Regions:
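TPR/TPR-like alpha-solenoid repeats
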Residues: 25, 44, 62, 99-102
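Amphipathic alpha-helical segments of tetratricopeptide repeats
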Residues: 2-7, 36-45, 77-83, 87
């Protein structure tokens, strides 16, 4: 079933994941709109460091497309610290390579 009003239907952490998943779906089509959901998810809180790292990595990608290099660098470094199993190592390295070209 579709959640019509997440603020009243879900607890804070669930709202965080609701926004996180919404952001992931939107990142395929509309990065600018996805940015809003990722920021809200981080603000509300996510339980797993991995999820937080993915959200920050996506935000870094948005910052890069908008030519905000400093913000992208900070978000990438935060994502790298949160990525304890090195699952995002390849994506982080790729994004840092793209930054060098800017």
């Amino acid at each position: 079933a579709y959640i019509k009003n997440p603020e009243t239907a879900l607890v804070r952490k669930q709202q965080g994941y609701f926004n996180y998943l919404h952001g992931i779906m939107l990142s395929q089509t509309n990065l600018i709109q996805a940015e809003k959901y990722f920021k809200k998810a981080i603000e509300l809180g996510l339980n797993m460091d991995m999820d937080l790292a993915v959200a920050k990595l996506n935000l870094a990608g948005v910052a890069l497309t908008r030519r905000r290099k400093l913000e992208a660098t900070n978000l990438l470094n935060e994502a790298k610290k949160l990525d304890k199993q090195n699952m995002l190592k390849e994506q982080i390295t790729m994004m840092k390579e793209q930054m060098k070209k800017m």
